[in-house]
Protein backbone atom coordinates (compact mmCIF):
# COMPACT_ATOMS: atom_id res chain seq x y z
CA UNK A 1 0.00 0.00 0.00
CA UNK A 2 1.39 3.40 -0.95
CA UNK A 3 1.59 5.38 2.31
CA UNK A 4 0.72 8.56 0.41
CA UNK A 5 -2.41 7.06 -1.13
CA UNK A 6 -5.29 9.36 -0.14
CA UNK A 7 -7.82 6.53 -0.27
CA UNK A 8 -5.94 4.57 2.37
CA UNK A 9 -5.87 7.54 4.73
CA UNK A 10 -9.56 8.21 4.07
CA UNK A 11 -10.47 4.63 4.96
CA UNK A 12 -8.42 4.77 8.15
CA UNK A 13 -10.40 7.68 9.60
CA UNK A 14 -13.57 5.62 9.58
CA UNK A 15 -11.74 2.83 11.39
CA UNK A 16 -9.87 5.09 13.79
CA UNK A 17 -12.56 7.58 14.86
CA UNK A 18 -13.88 5.46 17.77
CA UNK A 19 -10.33 4.85 18.98
CA UNK A 20 -9.52 8.57 18.78
CA UNK A 21 -12.55 9.41 20.89
CA UNK A 22 -11.59 6.71 23.40
CA UNK A 23 -8.05 8.10 23.61
CA UNK A 24 -9.47 11.51 24.50
CA UNK A 25 -11.62 9.95 27.21
CA UNK A 26 -8.86 7.78 28.64
CA UNK A 27 -5.77 9.97 28.29
CA UNK A 28 -7.11 13.50 27.83
CA UNK A 29 -6.28 16.10 25.20
CA UNK A 30 -4.22 17.09 23.41
CA UNK A 31 -2.78 13.66 22.60
CA UNK A 32 -0.50 12.33 19.88
CA UNK A 33 -1.75 9.15 18.21
CA UNK A 34 0.09 6.73 15.92
CA UNK A 35 -1.83 4.28 13.74
CA UNK A 36 0.47 1.24 13.61
CA UNK A 37 -1.32 -0.25 10.59
CA UNK A 38 -0.39 2.86 8.59
CA UNK A 39 3.23 2.63 9.75
CA UNK A 40 3.39 -0.98 8.61
CA UNK A 41 1.84 -0.12 5.25
CA UNK A 42 4.32 2.70 4.69
CA UNK A 43 7.28 0.52 5.66
CA UNK A 44 6.11 -2.17 3.25
CA UNK A 45 5.83 0.37 0.42
CA UNK A 46 9.34 1.71 0.98
CA UNK A 47 10.73 -1.80 1.35
CA UNK A 48 9.10 -2.84 -1.92
CA UNK A 49 10.56 0.17 -3.74
CA UNK A 50 14.03 -0.26 -2.22
CA UNK A 51 14.43 -3.99 -1.46
CA UNK A 52 17.59 -5.67 -0.18
CA UNK A 53 20.49 -5.22 -0.68
CA UNK A 54 19.46 -1.59 -0.14
CA UNK A 55 20.30 -0.54 3.42
CA UNK A 56 17.25 1.19 4.91
CA UNK A 57 17.41 3.46 7.93
CA UNK A 58 14.71 5.54 9.53
CA UNK A 59 15.52 9.22 10.08
CA UNK A 60 14.76 9.85 13.75
CA UNK A 61 14.34 13.59 13.32
CA UNK A 62 10.88 12.90 11.86
CA UNK A 63 9.67 11.26 15.09
CA UNK A 64 12.13 10.09 17.73
CA UNK A 65 9.73 8.22 20.03
CA UNK A 66 11.77 5.13 21.07
CA UNK A 67 8.73 2.84 20.97
CA UNK A 68 8.12 3.87 17.35
CA UNK A 69 11.81 3.49 16.43
CA UNK A 70 11.65 -0.03 17.87
CA UNK A 71 8.60 -0.89 15.75
CA UNK A 72 10.38 0.33 12.61
CA UNK A 73 13.50 -1.63 13.54
CA UNK A 74 11.31 -4.71 13.61
CA UNK A 75 10.17 -3.83 10.08
CA UNK A 76 13.74 -3.74 8.74
CA UNK A 77 14.82 -0.13 9.31
CA UNK A 78 17.96 0.90 11.15
CA UNK A 79 18.42 4.39 12.53
CA UNK A 80 19.79 7.61 11.06
CA UNK A 81 20.64 10.08 13.85
CA UNK A 82 22.00 13.63 13.97
CA UNK A 83 23.14 13.90 17.61
CA UNK A 84 24.18 11.87 20.62
CA UNK A 85 20.67 12.43 21.94
CA UNK A 86 19.06 10.72 18.97
CA UNK A 87 21.78 8.06 19.09
CA UNK A 88 20.82 7.34 22.72
CA UNK A 89 17.14 7.10 21.75
CA UNK A 90 17.95 4.65 18.94
CA UNK A 91 20.03 2.56 21.33
CA UNK A 92 17.18 2.61 23.86
CA UNK A 93 14.93 1.31 21.08
CA UNK A 94 17.26 -1.66 20.57
CA UNK A 95 19.00 -0.60 17.35
CA UNK A 96 22.66 -1.77 17.37
CA UNK A 97 25.46 0.64 16.47
CA UNK A 98 26.17 -1.42 13.36
CA UNK A 99 22.83 -0.23 11.97
CA UNK A 100 23.06 3.41 13.12
CA UNK A 101 24.50 6.24 11.02
CA UNK A 102 25.49 9.61 12.49
CA UNK A 103 24.89 12.64 10.31
CA UNK A 104 23.76 16.24 10.75
CA UNK A 105 25.16 19.72 10.25
CA UNK A 106 25.81 20.39 13.96
CA UNK A 107 27.96 17.53 15.26
CA UNK A 108 29.95 18.66 18.29
CA UNK A 109 33.39 17.50 19.42
CA UNK A 110 31.60 15.40 22.04
CA UNK A 111 29.52 13.73 19.30
CA UNK A 112 32.65 12.94 17.29
CA UNK A 113 34.55 11.64 20.33
CA UNK A 114 31.61 9.35 21.10
CA UNK A 115 31.80 7.90 17.58
CA UNK A 116 35.55 7.34 17.97
CA UNK A 117 35.08 5.70 21.38
CA UNK A 118 32.44 3.35 19.97
CA UNK A 119 34.90 2.22 17.30
CA UNK A 120 37.61 1.74 19.91
CA UNK A 121 35.21 -0.42 21.94
CA UNK A 122 34.59 -2.65 18.92
CA UNK A 123 30.99 -1.46 18.41
CA UNK A 124 31.38 1.19 15.70
CA UNK A 125 28.59 3.09 14.04
CA UNK A 126 27.85 2.04 10.49
CA UNK A 127 29.36 5.35 9.43
CA UNK A 128 29.63 9.04 10.22
CA UNK A 129 28.66 11.45 7.41
CA UNK A 130 30.92 14.51 7.37
CA UNK A 131 29.69 17.96 6.37
CA UNK A 132 32.94 19.90 5.94
CA UNK A 133 36.73 19.84 5.99
CA UNK A 134 36.58 21.27 9.52
CA UNK A 135 34.46 18.35 10.66
CA UNK A 136 36.76 15.84 8.97
CA UNK A 137 39.75 17.34 10.78
CA UNK A 138 37.91 17.32 14.12
CA UNK A 139 36.94 13.65 13.82
CA UNK A 140 40.46 12.72 12.72
CA UNK A 141 41.86 14.44 15.83
CA UNK A 142 39.41 12.58 18.06
CA UNK A 143 40.32 9.22 16.52
CA UNK A 144 44.07 9.86 16.81
CA UNK A 145 43.74 10.95 20.43
CA UNK A 146 41.94 7.74 21.39
CA UNK A 147 44.25 5.62 19.24
CA UNK A 148 47.30 7.05 21.00
CA UNK A 149 45.92 5.89 24.35
CA UNK A 150 44.97 2.39 23.22
CA UNK A 151 47.24 -0.52 24.01
CA UNK A 152 48.27 -2.94 21.30
CA UNK A 153 46.19 -5.62 23.01
CA UNK A 154 43.11 -3.42 22.93
CA UNK A 155 43.62 -2.70 19.25
CA UNK A 156 43.87 -6.37 18.34
CA UNK A 157 40.88 -7.26 20.52
CA UNK A 158 38.74 -4.54 18.97
CA UNK A 159 39.89 -5.44 15.47
CA UNK A 160 38.79 -9.01 16.03
CA UNK A 161 35.26 -7.81 16.84
CA UNK A 162 34.99 -5.76 13.67
CA UNK A 163 36.08 -8.12 10.94
CA UNK A 164 33.42 -6.79 8.56
CA UNK A 165 35.51 -3.78 7.55
CA UNK A 166 34.11 -1.25 10.01
CA UNK A 167 35.88 0.45 12.89
CA UNK A 168 39.36 -1.09 13.23
CA UNK A 169 40.97 -2.70 10.22
CA UNK A 170 42.26 -6.16 11.10
CA UNK A 171 45.29 -5.74 8.85
CA UNK A 172 46.57 -2.46 10.20
CA UNK A 173 45.32 -2.72 13.83
CA UNK A 174 45.04 1.05 14.00
CA UNK A 175 41.86 2.79 15.05
CA UNK A 176 39.87 3.99 12.07
CA UNK A 177 36.29 5.22 11.69
CA UNK A 178 34.18 4.70 8.58
CA UNK A 179 32.92 7.96 7.09
CA UNK A 180 30.92 9.25 4.16
CA UNK A 181 31.32 12.73 2.73
CA UNK A 182 28.05 14.61 2.36
CA UNK A 183 27.78 16.01 -1.13
CA UNK A 184 25.89 19.22 -1.76
CA UNK A 185 24.65 18.38 -5.28
CA UNK A 186 23.85 22.02 -6.09
CA UNK A 187 20.42 21.33 -7.58
CA UNK A 188 17.05 23.06 -7.23
CA UNK A 189 15.05 20.74 -4.94
CA UNK A 190 11.69 22.22 -6.07
CA UNK A 191 10.34 22.32 -2.53
CA UNK A 192 9.66 24.88 0.19
CA UNK A 193 12.80 26.94 0.81
CA UNK A 194 12.77 25.89 4.44
CA UNK A 195 12.97 22.23 3.40
CA UNK A 196 15.67 22.54 0.72
CA UNK A 197 19.07 21.12 1.62
CA UNK A 198 20.66 20.36 -1.75
CA UNK A 199 20.73 23.87 -3.23
CA UNK A 200 24.06 25.56 -3.91
CA UNK A 201 23.45 28.19 -1.21
CA UNK A 202 22.50 25.61 1.43
CA UNK A 203 24.54 25.25 4.62
CA UNK A 204 24.55 21.48 4.18
CA UNK A 205 27.35 19.37 2.76
CA UNK A 206 30.42 19.78 0.58
CA UNK A 207 30.44 20.90 -3.02
CA UNK A 208 32.42 18.76 -5.44
CA UNK A 209 35.19 21.38 -5.36
CA UNK A 210 35.45 21.08 -1.55
CA UNK A 211 35.86 17.29 -1.49
CA UNK A 212 39.65 17.29 -1.87
CA UNK A 213 40.09 19.56 1.15
CA UNK A 214 37.91 17.26 3.26
CA UNK A 215 39.90 14.20 2.18
CA UNK A 216 43.15 15.93 3.11
CA UNK A 217 41.77 17.16 6.44
CA UNK A 218 40.79 13.60 7.32
CA UNK A 219 44.31 12.33 6.76
CA UNK A 220 43.97 10.97 3.24
CA UNK A 221 43.45 7.32 2.22
CA UNK A 222 45.67 5.92 4.99
CA UNK A 223 44.61 8.24 7.82
CA UNK A 224 42.34 7.65 10.81
CA UNK A 225 39.20 8.00 8.68
CA UNK A 226 38.24 5.26 6.26
CA UNK A 227 36.47 7.10 3.44
CA UNK A 228 33.66 4.81 2.30
CA UNK A 229 31.64 6.96 -0.09
CA UNK A 230 29.15 9.78 -0.47
CA UNK A 231 25.96 10.85 1.23
CA UNK A 232 23.44 13.27 -0.26
CA UNK A 233 20.03 14.62 0.64
CA UNK A 234 18.27 16.97 -1.74
CA UNK A 235 15.52 18.13 0.61
CA UNK A 236 12.15 17.15 2.03
CA UNK A 237 8.71 17.02 0.43
CA UNK A 238 10.13 16.63 -3.09
CA UNK A 239 7.26 17.26 -5.48
CA UNK A 240 8.97 15.62 -8.46
CA UNK A 241 11.75 13.13 -9.09
CA UNK A 242 13.76 15.40 -11.40
CA UNK A 243 15.95 17.14 -8.82
CA UNK A 244 16.51 13.88 -6.97
CA UNK A 245 17.54 12.17 -10.21
CA UNK A 246 19.99 14.98 -11.02
CA UNK A 247 21.50 14.83 -7.54
CA UNK A 248 21.95 11.05 -7.65
CA UNK A 249 23.51 11.33 -11.11
CA UNK A 250 26.05 13.82 -9.80
CA UNK A 251 26.73 11.68 -6.77
CA UNK A 252 27.35 8.58 -8.88
CA UNK A 253 29.66 10.47 -11.23
CA UNK A 254 31.73 11.89 -8.36
CA UNK A 255 31.87 8.55 -6.58
CA UNK A 256 33.10 6.88 -9.77
CA UNK A 257 35.82 9.52 -10.12
CA UNK A 258 37.01 9.25 -6.52
CA UNK A 259 36.82 5.46 -6.43
CA UNK A 260 39.74 5.35 -8.85
CA UNK A 261 42.06 6.55 -6.08
CA UNK A 262 40.13 5.30 -3.04
CA UNK A 263 39.45 1.55 -3.22
CA UNK A 264 37.25 1.74 -0.09
CA UNK A 265 35.00 4.40 -1.67
CA UNK A 266 32.12 2.01 -2.36
CA UNK A 267 28.93 3.48 -0.83
CA UNK A 268 26.23 5.90 -1.96
CA UNK A 269 23.58 7.01 0.52
CA UNK A 270 20.81 8.87 -1.33
CA UNK A 271 19.06 10.19 1.80
CA UNK A 272 15.28 10.57 1.86
CA UNK A 273 12.85 13.36 1.08
CA UNK A 274 9.96 11.27 -0.26
CA UNK A 275 6.84 13.43 0.01
CA UNK A 276 3.58 13.09 1.88
CA UNK A 277 1.02 15.66 0.71
CA UNK A 278 -2.41 16.70 1.97
CA UNK A 279 -5.22 14.50 0.74
CA UNK A 280 -6.04 15.08 -2.90
CA UNK A 281 -2.63 16.50 -3.87
CA UNK A 282 -0.71 14.25 -6.28
CA UNK A 283 2.91 13.46 -5.36
CA UNK A 284 5.34 10.77 -6.51
CA UNK A 285 5.53 7.68 -4.32
CA UNK A 286 8.86 6.05 -3.28
CA UNK A 287 8.68 3.67 -6.22
CA UNK A 288 8.71 6.62 -8.63
CA UNK A 289 12.11 7.65 -7.26
CA UNK A 290 13.44 4.09 -7.22
CA UNK A 291 12.63 3.64 -10.91
CA UNK A 292 15.22 6.31 -11.75
CA UNK A 293 18.09 4.21 -10.40
CA UNK A 294 18.64 1.49 -13.04
CA UNK A 295 19.33 3.95 -15.86
CA UNK A 296 21.57 6.07 -13.65
CA UNK A 297 23.63 3.07 -12.57
CA UNK A 298 23.86 1.75 -16.12
CA UNK A 299 25.59 4.97 -17.17
CA UNK A 300 28.49 4.28 -14.75
CA UNK A 301 31.26 1.75 -15.59
CA UNK A 302 30.63 -1.47 -13.70
CA UNK A 303 33.90 -1.30 -11.74
CA UNK A 304 33.11 2.24 -10.55
CA UNK A 305 29.54 1.68 -9.34
CA UNK A 306 28.80 1.67 -5.60
CA UNK A 307 28.78 -1.71 -3.90
CA UNK A 308 26.41 -0.43 -1.20
CA UNK A 309 23.30 1.70 -1.62
CA UNK A 310 21.38 3.22 1.28
CA UNK A 311 18.28 5.33 1.89
CA UNK A 312 17.13 7.24 4.98
CA UNK A 313 13.38 7.94 4.80
CA UNK A 314 11.65 9.66 7.68
CA UNK A 315 8.43 11.53 6.91
CA UNK A 316 7.07 8.99 4.43
CA UNK A 317 7.16 6.24 7.07
CA UNK A 318 5.28 8.03 9.83
CA UNK A 319 3.52 11.20 8.68
CA UNK A 320 0.25 9.64 7.51
CA UNK A 321 0.10 7.46 10.62
CA UNK A 322 -0.01 10.39 13.02
CA UNK A 323 -3.02 12.20 14.49
CA UNK A 324 -3.44 14.83 17.17
CA UNK A 325 -6.67 14.60 19.15
CA UNK A 326 -7.76 17.97 20.52
CA UNK A 327 -10.71 19.51 22.33
CA UNK A 328 -12.66 22.65 21.46
CA UNK A 329 -12.19 25.51 23.95
CA UNK A 330 -14.01 28.44 22.29
CA UNK A 331 -16.46 28.97 19.44
CA UNK A 332 -17.07 32.52 18.21
CA UNK A 333 -19.04 34.15 15.41
CA UNK A 334 -17.45 37.36 14.20
CA UNK A 335 -17.76 39.88 11.43
CA UNK A 336 -14.22 40.51 10.26
CA UNK A 337 -12.44 43.68 11.45
CA UNK A 338 -11.11 46.30 8.99
CA UNK A 339 -8.82 43.65 7.60
CA UNK A 340 -9.40 40.00 6.78
CA UNK A 341 -8.35 37.70 9.64
CA UNK A 342 -4.59 37.23 9.40
CA UNK A 343 -3.51 34.25 7.38
CA UNK A 344 -0.17 32.51 7.01
CA UNK A 345 2.03 33.79 4.22
CA UNK A 346 2.87 30.50 2.52
CA UNK A 347 6.14 31.91 1.17
CA UNK A 348 7.98 32.32 4.44
CA UNK A 349 8.34 31.04 7.97
CA UNK A 350 6.51 32.79 10.78
CA UNK A 351 5.22 35.66 8.67
CA UNK A 352 1.67 36.96 8.20
CA UNK A 353 -0.09 38.42 5.21
CA UNK A 354 -3.16 40.59 5.89
CA UNK A 355 -5.76 40.78 3.16
CA UNK A 356 -7.49 44.21 3.01
CA UNK A 357 -11.17 44.19 3.96
CA UNK A 358 -12.03 45.54 0.51
CA UNK A 359 -10.91 42.19 -0.90
CA UNK A 360 -13.65 40.32 0.95
CA UNK A 361 -16.56 39.17 -1.14
CA UNK A 362 -19.15 39.54 1.64
CA UNK A 363 -19.62 40.51 5.25
CA UNK A 364 -20.75 37.14 6.47
CA UNK A 365 -19.90 36.16 10.02
CA UNK A 366 -16.82 34.05 10.37
CA UNK A 367 -16.86 31.12 12.76
CA UNK A 368 -13.68 30.92 14.85
CA UNK A 369 -12.81 27.83 16.85
CA UNK A 370 -9.96 27.64 19.37
CA UNK A 371 -8.73 24.15 20.29
CA UNK A 372 -6.32 22.95 22.98
CA UNK A 373 -3.59 21.88 20.52
CA UNK A 374 -1.45 24.48 18.81
CA UNK A 375 1.98 25.34 17.52
CA UNK A 376 3.55 23.81 20.62
CA UNK A 377 2.23 20.42 19.49
CA UNK A 378 2.47 21.01 15.72
CA UNK A 379 4.89 23.72 14.65
CA UNK A 380 4.76 23.08 10.90
CA UNK A 381 1.78 25.32 9.99
CA UNK A 382 3.40 28.32 11.72
CA UNK A 383 6.91 27.50 10.51
CA UNK A 384 6.29 26.47 6.90
CA UNK A 385 2.66 27.29 6.25
CA UNK A 386 2.08 23.52 6.12
CA UNK A 387 -1.51 22.39 5.69
CA UNK A 388 -3.00 19.73 7.97
CA UNK A 389 -6.67 18.80 7.68
CA UNK A 390 -8.78 19.15 10.83
CA UNK A 391 -11.76 16.80 11.12
CA UNK A 392 -14.57 16.62 13.67
CA UNK A 393 -14.90 13.61 15.95
CA UNK A 394 -17.93 14.96 17.82
CA UNK A 395 -20.53 17.65 17.14
CA UNK A 396 -22.46 19.11 20.07
CA UNK A 397 -21.39 16.12 22.11
CA UNK A 398 -22.39 13.44 19.59
CA UNK A 399 -20.08 11.26 17.49
CA UNK A 400 -19.90 12.25 13.83
CA UNK A 401 -18.58 10.84 10.58
CA UNK A 402 -16.74 13.75 8.98
CA UNK A 403 -18.29 15.00 5.76
CA UNK A 404 -14.89 16.48 5.04
CA UNK A 405 -13.99 12.98 3.91
CA UNK A 406 -16.44 13.35 1.03
CA UNK A 407 -14.44 16.30 -0.24
CA UNK A 408 -11.25 14.30 -0.06
CA UNK A 409 -12.89 11.30 -1.69
CA UNK A 410 -13.82 13.36 -4.73
CA UNK A 411 -10.48 15.11 -4.92
CA UNK A 412 -8.53 11.90 -4.41
CA UNK A 413 -10.40 10.02 -7.11
CA UNK A 414 -9.92 12.86 -9.55
CA UNK A 415 -6.23 13.31 -8.80
CA UNK A 416 -5.62 9.57 -8.87
CA UNK A 417 -6.82 9.45 -12.45
CA UNK A 418 -4.78 12.47 -13.45
CA UNK A 419 -1.30 10.92 -13.19
CA UNK A 420 1.20 13.23 -14.89
CA UNK A 421 -0.98 14.35 -17.79
CA UNK A 422 -1.45 18.13 -17.74
CA UNK A 423 -4.88 17.94 -19.36
CA UNK A 424 -5.93 15.24 -16.91
CA UNK A 425 -4.74 17.35 -13.99
CA UNK A 426 -6.80 20.29 -15.25
CA UNK A 427 -9.85 18.03 -15.53
CA UNK A 428 -9.15 16.62 -12.08
CA UNK A 429 -9.06 20.09 -10.57
CA UNK A 430 -12.38 20.93 -12.19
CA UNK A 431 -13.91 17.67 -10.94
CA UNK A 432 -12.67 18.31 -7.40
CA UNK A 433 -14.04 21.85 -7.47
CA UNK A 434 -17.42 20.64 -8.66
CA UNK A 435 -17.51 17.99 -5.97
CA UNK A 436 -16.74 20.57 -3.28
CA UNK A 437 -19.49 22.85 -4.58
CA UNK A 438 -22.00 20.02 -4.41
CA UNK A 439 -20.92 19.28 -0.86
CA UNK A 440 -21.35 22.95 0.03
CA UNK A 441 -24.93 22.84 -1.17
CA UNK A 442 -25.71 19.53 0.52
CA UNK A 443 -24.15 20.37 3.87
CA UNK A 444 -25.16 24.02 4.32
CA UNK A 445 -28.59 23.12 5.64
CA UNK A 446 -27.11 20.86 8.34
CA UNK A 447 -24.75 23.53 9.64
CA UNK A 448 -21.48 22.35 8.11
CA UNK A 449 -19.37 25.31 7.03
CA UNK A 450 -15.84 26.61 6.69
CA UNK A 451 -14.40 27.32 10.12
CA UNK A 452 -11.11 28.91 11.08
CA UNK A 453 -9.33 26.69 13.58
CA UNK A 454 -6.77 28.32 15.88
CA UNK A 455 -4.56 27.03 18.65
CA UNK A 456 -4.32 28.26 22.26
CA UNK A 457 -0.83 29.79 22.10
CA UNK A 458 -0.24 33.53 22.54
CA UNK A 459 0.88 34.02 18.92
CA UNK A 460 -1.20 35.10 15.93
CA UNK A 461 0.62 32.54 13.78
CA UNK A 462 -0.88 29.76 15.89
CA UNK A 463 -3.56 28.78 13.38
CA UNK A 464 -4.46 25.72 11.34
CA UNK A 465 -6.43 27.59 8.69
CA UNK A 466 -9.98 26.96 7.47
CA UNK A 467 -11.70 23.57 7.52
CA UNK A 468 -15.21 22.34 6.79
CA UNK A 469 -16.68 21.33 10.14
CA UNK A 470 -20.12 20.73 11.68
CA UNK A 471 -21.55 22.83 14.51
CA UNK A 472 -19.15 22.68 17.45
CA UNK A 473 -19.32 23.68 21.10
CA UNK A 474 -16.88 23.73 23.99
CA UNK A 475 -15.77 20.19 24.78
CA UNK A 476 -16.24 18.75 21.29
CA UNK A 477 -13.37 16.71 19.84
CA UNK A 478 -11.44 17.24 16.63
CA UNK A 479 -8.46 15.45 15.09
CA UNK A 480 -5.57 16.88 13.09
CA UNK A 481 -4.31 14.45 10.51
CA UNK A 482 -0.90 13.57 9.03
CA UNK A 483 0.98 14.72 12.14
CA UNK A 484 3.26 11.71 12.60
CA UNK A 485 6.33 13.51 11.22
CA UNK A 486 7.77 16.68 12.76
CA UNK A 487 4.89 16.96 15.19
CA UNK A 488 5.97 15.53 18.54
CA UNK A 489 9.62 15.76 17.46
CA UNK A 490 9.36 19.57 17.15
CA UNK A 491 7.08 20.21 20.11
CA UNK A 492 7.97 22.81 22.72
CA UNK A 493 6.97 23.76 26.23
CA UNK A 494 6.30 27.37 25.21
CA UNK A 495 3.54 28.95 27.32
CA UNK A 496 4.30 26.35 29.99
CA UNK A 497 2.69 23.42 28.19
CA UNK A 498 3.68 19.90 29.31
CA UNK A 499 4.32 17.14 26.79
CA UNK A 500 1.12 15.40 25.58
CA UNK A 501 0.83 11.63 25.87
CA UNK A 502 1.62 9.45 22.87
CA UNK A 503 -0.65 6.50 22.15
CA UNK A 504 -0.46 3.68 19.60
CA UNK A 505 -3.57 2.28 17.96
CA UNK A 506 -2.48 -1.30 17.34
CA UNK A 507 -3.45 -3.28 14.26
CA UNK A 508 -6.11 -5.10 16.29
CA UNK A 509 -7.57 -1.80 17.51
CA UNK A 510 -6.21 -1.98 21.05
CA UNK A 511 -4.46 1.02 22.60
CA UNK A 512 -0.87 1.16 23.88
CA UNK A 513 0.40 4.11 25.91
CA UNK A 514 3.84 4.74 24.39
CA UNK A 515 4.67 7.85 26.46
CA UNK A 516 2.87 9.32 29.44
CA UNK A 517 1.70 12.91 29.63
CA UNK A 518 4.29 15.21 31.17
CA UNK A 519 3.36 16.88 34.42
CA UNK A 520 3.87 20.43 35.61
CA UNK A 521 6.92 19.23 37.53
CA UNK A 522 8.60 18.40 34.20
CA UNK A 523 8.61 22.08 33.21
CA UNK A 524 11.52 24.37 33.94
What are these regions (language model features)?
Residues 1-133, 137-144, 150, 165-167, ...:
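A charged N-terminal "starter" segment
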Residues 292, 306-338, 359-524:
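Charged (often Lys/Glu-rich) extended helix/loop segments that serve as interaction or gating elements
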Residues 59, 131, 178-184, 231-233, ...:
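Short beta-strand segments
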Residues 79-80, 100, 128, 230, ...:
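Hydrophobic residues within beta-strands of alpha/beta enzymes
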Residues 39, 61, 83, 115, ...:
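Conserved, mostly hydrophobic/aromatic
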Residues 69, 92-93, 112-117, 139-143, ...:
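Short acidic, glycine/serine/threonine-rich loops at helix termini
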Residues 148-149, 155, 165, 172, ...:
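Active-site loop/helix belt of alpha/beta enzymes
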Residues 106-107, 133-136, 144, 184-188, ...:
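Short acidic/polar capping segments at secondary-structure boundaries
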Amino acid sequence: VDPATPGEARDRLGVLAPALREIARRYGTPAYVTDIASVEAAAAAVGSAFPAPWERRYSLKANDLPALVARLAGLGFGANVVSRGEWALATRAGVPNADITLEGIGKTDADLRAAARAAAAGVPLRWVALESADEAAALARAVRAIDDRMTATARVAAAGQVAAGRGLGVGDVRLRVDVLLRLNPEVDPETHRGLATGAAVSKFGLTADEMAAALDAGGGPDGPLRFRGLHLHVGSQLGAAGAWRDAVRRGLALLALLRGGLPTFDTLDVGGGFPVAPLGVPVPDPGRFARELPALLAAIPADRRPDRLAIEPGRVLVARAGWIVARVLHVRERIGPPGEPARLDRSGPLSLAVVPREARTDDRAERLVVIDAGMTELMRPALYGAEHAVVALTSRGHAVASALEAVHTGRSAAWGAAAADRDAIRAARQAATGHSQRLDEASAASGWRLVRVDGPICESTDTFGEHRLPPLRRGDLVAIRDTGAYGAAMRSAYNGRPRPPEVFVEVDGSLTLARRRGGLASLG
